[in-house]
Regions:
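N-terminal metal-binding scaffold of metallo-dependent hydrolase/deaminase domains
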Residues: 1-41
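Histidine-centered divalent metal-coordination motifs
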Residues: 62-66, 180, 238, 265
Length: 275
């Protein structure tokens, strides 16, 4: 089996940077050497990484590979190759495809496609609906990375808007629940208001006004409340307001059942309308 030595790199891993070397055997990391440590086994290829950073393959837990059904946009082959080219070696695919990944049959179809076409490691989310929570018990955590829950409308029309269904979802699985949180009632009220003023030609600049800070906060607040009641594992995707941060604990990550993330682009925007 081929052994490759990448030496003299600045290794970035788990929040630390150290000068060292890495030995790859076949497709797996065999040794991580720090400082002046040397491997004792000969290597077939030696790469001098002086002045370079060496990072482990990244995990992207929120991808839209558009396959099946939306491949006029992209597909598993093109997107997984793009991921690999960018240093992303593991992905988790979202369920708002066509058909939606909301049944066990659709899940099997998605996983079969990924197995045959993906250039990187993969898993996928199972999409929640108002009535499919009985299927959660049949999901294998080694095949499914979590339940995707749309608490606000988005691409794919997968909104879950019944309180009874939400309680069944949060109380019906030990899998991570990855939630898209925007209050649909507030969105609808704002949409109706601006459609009265502009008809069907509502300016794009009003997007952050329609999907407002209040809409984000109220939905995230509800998700956190339901997760606490059920002791569910909740992760809120792409929060977009500073106000939402008050909903989360700053306890050590390993102890948390409720977490959140922000997209980097959202750190550079404001809710003010813009051209």
């Amino acid at each position: 089996m081929k052994r490759t030595l990448i030496q003299n790199a600045v290794i970035v891993n788990e929040g630390r940077k150290v000068l060292g070397s890495v030995v790859i055997e076949g497709e797996k990391i065999a040794e991580i050497l720090t400082g002046e440590e040397k491997t004792t086994t000969p290597c077939d290829e030696i790469i001098d990484a002086t002045g370079c950073y060496l990072l482990p393959g990244a995990i992207d837990e929120h991808v839209h590979f558009r396959d099946p059904g939306l491949t006029h946009k992209a597909d598993i082959t093109t997107e997984s190759r793009a991921a690999a080219a960018g240093g992303v070696t593991s992905i988790m695919d979202m369920p708002n495809t066509n058909p939606q990944t909301t049944t066990l049959e659709a899940l099997d179809e998605k996983l079969t496609l990924l197995a045959g076409k993906s250039a990187v490691n993969y898993s996928c989310y199972f999409g929640a609906t108002n009535n499919n929570y009985p299927q959660f018990a049949q999901l294998d955590k080694h095949r499914v990375c979590g339940i995707k829950l749309f608490m606000g409308s988005s691409t794919g029309n997968m909104l879950v808007d019944r309180m009874a269904s939400l309680r069944n979802i949060f109380g019906g699985t030990d899998l991570l629940i990855a939630a898209h949180c925007e209050d649909q009632g507030i969105i609808k009220e704002n949409t109706d208001k601006y459609k009265k003023a502009y008809g069907d030609d509502v300016p794009l600049t009003l997007h952050p006004v329609i999907r407002s800070e209040e809409a984000c906060y109220r939905s995230s607040e509800l998700a956190v409340q339901l997760a606490r009641e059920a002791n569910a594992r909740l992760h809120i995707m792409h929060i977009s307001t500073a106000r939402e941060l008050d909903l989360f604990s700053d306890a050590p990550l390993i102890t948390k059942r409720i977490t959140a993330e922000a997209c980097v682009c959202l750190l550079y925007t404001s809710p003010s309308p813009r051209d």
